[in-house]
């Protein structure tokens, strides 16, 4: 009986030791995970490197963009608006892709430079430049259709919707970091900037409406650089690209440009 009791006690002790070892291992694992998460957050909050910021931004953007896209695709819908999207924006993008491929063919295959200026297939015949400059000509992102077949233009169209929004967030965050804003505030401000209701609504209906959201922070940052006697190239290039991209939004950018320049001037000097 005594031997049996000792054997039972030994079994209980060994079992207890086993449970304690498992609990301690779980505790150590959780502690290390907490420590790792803390290290990641401290690294994200540090001001030394912004690589972690943009990695996290890209991941969060991908999740939110995927969720938005799923709401359409899951219901059998496309991101191309049935009114202005198909007859104007999508057709202009596909036409511009064919136009660019035709120009490249004449240059590299026929070894001559010919820029078609008139097309009888546009309405009753129209000037190509005056017809397309409002939609695609001048926008650097609309050069991408040259690499995409016409039957795949819809896929590129949907990609460009999110790409413009993504670049708008990059542009806004660069502006915030230039003004020494902390990463956490910049991160939240960037998400609010690119996923506001108007941004999503406008980007789905008229994709190039997102372009001024890319250019404006760079133009304003260029003004700050000039006031600080830094090189003016950012202001010059951002203003030039925004002017070539779309005259309709350029005059709006100019209004904010003058207001911001005056505000910063009296604030600095």
Predicted regions and their residues:
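Hydrophobic alpha-helical signal peptides and transmembrane signal-/tail-anchor segments
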Residues: 1-4
């Amino acid at each position: 009986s005594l031997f049996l009791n000792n054997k039972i006690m030994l079994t209980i002790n060994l079992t207890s030791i086993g449970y304690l070892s498992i609990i301690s291992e779980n505790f150590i694992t959780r502690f290390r995970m907490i420590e790792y998460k803390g290290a990641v957050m401290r690294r994200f909050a540090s001001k030394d490197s912004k690589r972690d910021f943009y990695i996290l931004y890209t991941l969060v953007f991908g999740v939110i963009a995927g969720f938005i896209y799923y709401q359409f695709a899951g219901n059998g819908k496309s991101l191309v608006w049935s009114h202005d999207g198909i007859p104007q924006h999508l057709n202009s993008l596909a036409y511009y892709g064919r136009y660019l491929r035709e120009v490249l063919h004449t240059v590299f295959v026929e070894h001559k430079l010919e820029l078609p200026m008139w097309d009888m297939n546009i309405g009753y015949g129209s000037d190509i430049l005056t017809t397309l400059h409002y939609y695609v000509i001048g926008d650097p992102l609309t050069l991408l259709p040259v690499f995409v077949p016409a039957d795949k233009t819809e896929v590129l169209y949907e990609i460009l919707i999110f790409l413009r929004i993504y670049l708008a967030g990059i542009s806004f965050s660069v502006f915030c970091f230039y003004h020494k804003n902390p990463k956490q505030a910049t991160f939240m401000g960037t998400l609010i900037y690119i996923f506001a209701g108007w941004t999503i609504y406008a980007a789905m209906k008229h994709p190039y409406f997102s372009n001024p959201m890319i250019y404006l922070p760079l133009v304003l940052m260029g003004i700050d650089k000039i006031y600080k006697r830094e090189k003016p190239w950012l202001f010059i290039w951002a203003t030039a690209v925004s002017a070539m991209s779309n005259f309709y939004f350029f005059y709006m950018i100019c209004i904010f440009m003058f207001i911001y320049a005056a505000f910063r001037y009296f604030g600095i000097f």
